[in-house]
Amino acid sequence: FQFAAFCGSFRAHGRTWWTRLPWGWGGSDMGPREFNNTNAAIPAGDRRNILETEMNNPAIEPVVRKYDELRYQLMPYTYTSAREARDSGLPLMRALWVHYPEDPQARALGDEFLWGRDLLIAPVYAKGATSRDVYLPKGEWYDWWTRERSSGGKRVRRVVDLSTMPIYVRAGSIIPLDAVRQYTSQPVADPTTLQIFRGADGQYTLYDDDGISQAYLTGKGTWIRMTWTDKSRQLTIEPGAPTGATNVVG
């Protein structure tokens, strides 16, 4: 599920057919329990106990909620990246070599990727892992969860658990964050917040439209250009400043 939150198609359900809850992956060592009509031999009482267990998983549910909410908070960033994909052909999920073609290590990697331009995602794919090595390309990078700053051009070892998939942000990035919502069109009162990660100058162009119609095909959308000057800690926004807060990291 952690990895799914950074895929173009957000697969937000488990495999247990009964409930399809995101954490419905069963608890046996054999993997997910696939209940179907051939399970008629399971007594009805046991089936009820299984159902209740799947619906109440205090160890997993908070993790699912955390990444689900992050997916929605990053919607302005992801939506802008989707528009970029439509206009340029650049995918949402990008191999590191797309933006670091001269880096031989970036060209060789297949187990981490960029989400849009500025977020580096390193899924944990080894069962029971408590850490994983993450390669950071040239430049300065911030750990999304701790805000710890690291220099790139090398590997760093990141402690991991179920709730902490390694995510890094490129220095100079301007990341728009929305309020948590239950679905994409749900109105929210809180404004969009801009998270700025210091250490380099940066530029970002935020895109938005009505999110419903095909009007974007005829140019009905809004582009807001932003420029961050790191030395003077100055953010310039044009043509129309969005209503919201700005947080500077670093």
PLM regions with names:
Residues 1-170:
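Catalytic-domain carbohydrate-binding cleft regions of carbohydrate-active enzymes
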Residues 164-250:
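Accessory, solvent-exposed terminal regions and/or long lumenal/extracellular loops of proteins
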